[in-house]
Design a protein with these regions (language model features):
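Short mixed-charge
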Residues: 173-197
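ACP-dependent fatty acid/polyketide chain-elongation machinery
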Residues: 1-149, 347-358
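Active-site-proximal gating segment of KS-fold condensing enzymes and close homologs
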Residues: 151-157, 202-258, 298-318
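Acyl-CoA/ACP chain-elongation machinery
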Residues: 282-331
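Condensing-enzyme catalytic core mediating Claisen C-C bond formation in acyl metabolism
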Residues: 59, 318-358
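Stable alpha-helical structural segments in soluble proteins, enriched in small hydrophobic residues
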Residues: 159-171, 270
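Short conserved active-site loop signatures built around small residues
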Residues: 267
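Short acidic, glycine/serine/threonine-rich loops at helix termini
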Residues: 70-73, 215-219, 271-272, 296-304, ...
Length: 358
């Protein structure tokens, strides 16, 4: 075996690792090549190649954010509210506190000395009390999306749609009318899309964790409680979390397209993947959209219970004692919700539109 490392001068890239003293397989010793008989050798210059096909500066030319604790998720003052350090954490309603308590949770708790024990949750004081909860948001009213499209999306994907459209606007990337020519020769508007020159060079990455679960919960509850329940034919579209594909379809983006889920690092990793795409020449621009809403009523009852059971969620009711990141007094995570949109692209593309990147 050989250890490969960055840099041609790295001795680790050229030094063989000593084989184990005893064979690691069931084969006879004669069949296990030793250091003299082994035919494996690294190719000359076998090191990590960091030469990119497309050099140059990568910038963020547009961004948007939707945050909790506001009257409107994508209000005009969201950025200023963040800069001002305003508190956007609210108390969870009593019904949700009790619903979590009713789950018969056994919580993992760690003591100051590092020991851990499982503690049954019996008292409301032990439940979840704080969360970042979203305000008003309507994809149709605020962004002009047709109800047909909105109703085929779960809540998180709707938020991602809004964030993506706001980010494009912030990056000064227009959406122009799309037309269909009728048999009589007339042109009929069929929607809005990126300019033709941008469609093939724009990719989409959707970063999210809990897509579609809210829809599944609502449908399961309706099926169990409503005697007149009828199955929603849009169910599959809503639960599979295809916000990236639907967003690309809506804006006419034909570049690479994917969705990732690596928990709290999802958007961060999406930015890294976007840079890789740009450096490799896969596209010239990537719209990164990220969203989650685990604090709405149906989701909070279950996701909050999950965080509480693992000992990761705080059960503190005083926000001044709960919101203590990187502090020895911290006692758990405060669940939240929100959305983000980022336009990552080659610097010259932003410069050509007269955009000063962030």
């Amino acid at each position: 075996e050989y250890v490969l490392a960055r840099g041609e001068g790295s001795p680790a890239a050229q030094t063989p690792v000593e084989p184990p003293a005893t064979p690691v397989s069931a084969k006879s010793e004669a069949s296990v090549p030793g250091p003299e008989t082994s035919t494996f050798a690294p190719a000359e210059g076998d090191v990590l190649d960091t030469t990119w096909a497309v050099p140059g500066e990568i910038v963020c030319s547009g961004m948007s954010v939707g945050i909790p604790g506001q009257e409107m998720v994508f209000g005009d003052d969201v950025h200023q509210a963040i800069f001002d350090g305003k508190n956007h954490i609210d108390r969870v309603v009593d019904e949700t506190v009790q619903a979590i308590l009713n789950k018969n949770i056994t919580r993992l708790e760690k003591g100051p000395d590092g020991t851990a024990q499982y503690v049954p949750i019996k008292d409301p004081a032990q439940s979840v009390h704080l969360a970042g909860q979203l305000g008003s948001f309507d994809l149709c009213e605020e962004f002009g999306i047709e109800e047909r499209l909105r109703d085929g999306l779960d809540r998180a994907s709707q938020l991602a749609f809004g964030a993506g459209l706001d980010a494009l606007r912030n990056a000064r990337i227009p959406l122009v009318p799309r037309y269909r020519t009728t048999r009589s020769g007339k042109k009929v508007t069929t929607g809005w899309a990126l300019p033709d020159s941008m469609r093939d060079e724009t990719g989409i990455i959707y970063a999210a964790c809990f897509t579609g679960i809210d829809v599944a919960m609502k449908q399961a509850r309706a099926a169990a409680t409503d005697p007149n329940y009828t199955f929603d034919p849009r169910f599959l579209l809503q639960v599979i979390g295809m916000g990236h594909a639907r967003f690309a379809e809506f804006i006419g983006a034909r570049g690479p397209n994917t969705r990732i889920n690596v928990a709290c690092a999802s958007t961060t990793q999406a930015i890294g993947i976007a840079e890789d795409w740009l450096r490799l020449g896969r596209c010239k621009r990537v719209v990164v959209i990220g969203s989650d809403d685990v604090t709405e009523a149906d989701m909070m009852e279950w996701v909050g219970s999950g965080f509480l059971a693992t000992g990761a969620g705080t059960n503190e009711s005083d926000v001044t004692k709960a919101a203590l990141p990187f502090d020895k007094r911290r006692n758990g995570t405060i669940l939240g919700a929100g959305a983000v949109g980022l336009v990552i692209e080659n610097a010259e593309k932003a410069e050509n539109r007269g955009v000063v990147p962030y």
